[in-house]
Amino acid sequence: MFFKLLKDALKVKNVRNKILFTIFIIFVFRVGTHVTVPGINAESLKQLSDLPFLNMLNLVSGNAMNNFSIFSMGVSPYITASIIVQLLQMDIYPKFVEWGKQGEVGLRKFNQATRYITLVLAFVQSIGITASFNTLSSISLVKTPNVSTYLLIGTILTAGSIIVTWLGEQITDKGFGNGVSMIIFSGIIASIPKMFSTIYEDFFVNVRSGELTRSYIIVALLIVVGLAIVFFTTFVQQAEYQIPIQYTKLVQGAPTSSYLPLKVNPAGVIPVIFASSITTIPSTILPFFSKVTWLSHLQGLLSYNTPSGMITYAILIILFSFFYTFVQVNPEKTAENLQKNGSYIPSVRPGRETEKYMSSLLKRLATIGAVFLAFISLAPIAAQQFMHLTSSIALGGTSLLILISTGIEGMKQLEGYLLKRQYVGFMNLED
């Protein structure tokens, strides 16, 4: 189905150009991930390869942290800045609430504020990460560790993060898919060969002859679990709850009944990306507050290789699932639009009652989505910790979630482009 859809899409010039543009932008990003920051001893990173903090950073940076490249920060600062801006819109900061009522003008102001916050976060986190890695590695990461070197590295990494964010925006505006998701998606795809190579070495090369049977069993279980994750993720991400809609007789040309589709997991994979980004923050700012004891405890609390870290990661995913569900679907606006269009939900009064009904339904759907996302993300981490498996397995669930969700959204976008083209062609024939 996918290949047929892709074949049909490539026949359409506009869609083909979008796909080729996206591939070009991703190529530019991937090239940048191999350009190491000047003044860095990249060999020292090999000692840190098993750190949960580094693995999580690699995930949200699109696998750019392995070489401590100019794009090492990836879209992580932008994701964090987006969370901050969206939270401030919720009756927390009056000016942001006011902007939310200004339509396109307000949206441009939000985008500008997000960019400024991204700039500050990227610079602070860049220096923090460099200092953290330099401290943790026995081989000095920074060849000449002084203030001017740290400022230079921070500036380069900040510029890299801004460029990656801009590349993501170009994909969203002119290309195919969501830019942030596509950047992370490309990094996960690029890391797959290394992951399989690591699994092969850990289970079949660096083992004693008597442990081969155990290795075969574990690998077989991993394949089964991986296929199960693919199946259930695909099912949940495509599942819809259909709310019946009826129209008043006063609406000319409207059908007598229809339905309003809501995804069973309305927030998609964004809560996982948000949670992953948030867990990296304490480690990036810890060098600035090394004497603050509670911050060290917070770093341990957010490290997913500890029981408390796994619980915290799950809680963050659940909280962001509820938060982003109501960002995606606004019950008040939905009720208002239904009333304006002369439509209503059977047995539910238009207006305030419809808003309450939508809020209640969204909470139930968000609960299903949150539990699903948390389970898929946490299961491989728990398995890796309690069965002492290779660290490359830990974020396998999170990676699969992002891969499958981004792939499904991409297919739907392709279908939308093709349907729109067929509709426009039909209308032209009618004329």
Each model region followed by its residue ranges:
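N-terminal cationic and glycine-rich segments that engage phosphates or anionic surfaces
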Residues: 1-431
